[in-house]
């Protein structure tokens, strides 16, 4: 499990669990809802705050699209940690739109 923080300028900081990551974005779980379209800064261990936008959030799961891609080495490091953490809730997908 990789714990992180999503900081929103309106609401402050909320703890999250990172469950999926790519160069373009990440999936997470949280106890608190996030508004789609909200601007956030992602804080992860050893990573400078990374800006992005909430692109979906439902039932405690959500996704962030980064403003700029993460370096492939950073993605590989966090992806390996997620894989090592086990199958918990990895590879979240946004709900289908009706």
What are these regions (language model features)?
Residues 1-98:
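Structured alpha-helical
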């Amino acid at each position: 499990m990789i714990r992180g923080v999503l900081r929103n300028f309106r609401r402050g900081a909320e703890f999250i669990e990172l469950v999926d990551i790519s160069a373009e974005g990440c999936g997470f779980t949280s106890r608190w809802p996030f508004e789609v379209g909200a601007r956030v800064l992602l804080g992860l261990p050893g990573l400078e705050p990374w800006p992005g936008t909430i692109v979906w959030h439902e039932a405690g799961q959500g996704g962030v699209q980064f403003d700029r891609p993460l370096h492939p080495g950073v993605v590989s490091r966090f992806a390996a940690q997620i894989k090592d953490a086990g199958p918990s809730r990895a590879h979240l997908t946004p709900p289908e739109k009706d």
